[in-house]
């Protein structure tokens, strides 16, 4: 899509706020009204060999892109840097904003970056602990296939937790498809 988002909050520079994906469908997050809508940042962190970092929830077999919600007065870029470190253990560099994903629950600022240095221990919290989350280095095409498989396997699920995880996987799948389709990785 070539629509432009009117909000531009990363530093004072003009950045790419290309809307990658919009979904305002009626979903199942009524219990979360107090914390939505929220602002978040997420993205693709790619090594020089082409592999990317993903956050893997082993207990349910879910791959997700590193990212999460904005805290306090963070800029979207600061949020991505913090979340990337928390979920992957890596510091990141060469950070490029490529657009936004909007849905009824949040606006996610989408970035591409490179890891540097040695990975530190990750610090999962909440659902991340519950689902035995860990960081993996994987081929992006394989990650996309696994995301699509997860969506198909959970298509008929009716419990709220599975629906939420499937919805988040669909969002990340759209982001990764966009990145791969537009040759945005090195």
Feature annotation, model-predicted:
Residues 36-38, 47, 105-106, 128:
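A generic fold-level signal
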Residues 153-186:
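Charged phosphate-binding loop/patch that engages nucleotide di/tri-phosphates or the phosphate backbone
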Residues 2-42, 48:
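Acidic, metal-coordinating catalytic segment for phosphate/diphosphate chemistry
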Residues 38-40, 60, 65, 106-108:
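Short connector loops at helix/strand junctions that flank enzyme active sites
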Residues 45-48, 113-115:
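Active-site beta-strand termini and strand-to-loop segments that position acidic
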Residues 70-93, 101-155, 186:
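Unchanged
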């Amino acid at each position: 899509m070539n629509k432009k988002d009117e909000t531009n909050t990363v530093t004072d520079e003009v950045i790419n706020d290309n809307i990658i994906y919009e979904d305002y469908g009626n979903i199942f997050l009524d219990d979360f009204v107090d914390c939505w809508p929220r602002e978040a940042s997420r993205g693709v962190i790619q090594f020089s060999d082409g592999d990317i970092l993903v956050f893997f929830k082993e207990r349910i077999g879910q791959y997700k892109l590193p990212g999460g919600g904005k805290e306090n007065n963070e800029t979207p870029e600061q949020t991505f840097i913090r979340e990337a470190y928390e979920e992957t253990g890596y510091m990141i560099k060469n950070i490029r904003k490529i657009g936004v994903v909007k849905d009824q629950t949040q606006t996610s600022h989408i970035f591409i970056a490179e890891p540097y240095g040695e990975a530190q221990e990750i610090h999962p919290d909440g659902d991340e602990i519950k689902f035995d989350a860990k960081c993996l280095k994987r081929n992006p095409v394989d990650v996309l296939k696994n995301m699509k498989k997860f969506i198909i396997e959970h298509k008929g699920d009716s419990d709220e937790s599975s629906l939420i995880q499937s919805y988040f996987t669909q969002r990340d799948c759209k982001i990764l498809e966009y990145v791969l389709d537009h040759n945005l990785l090195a």
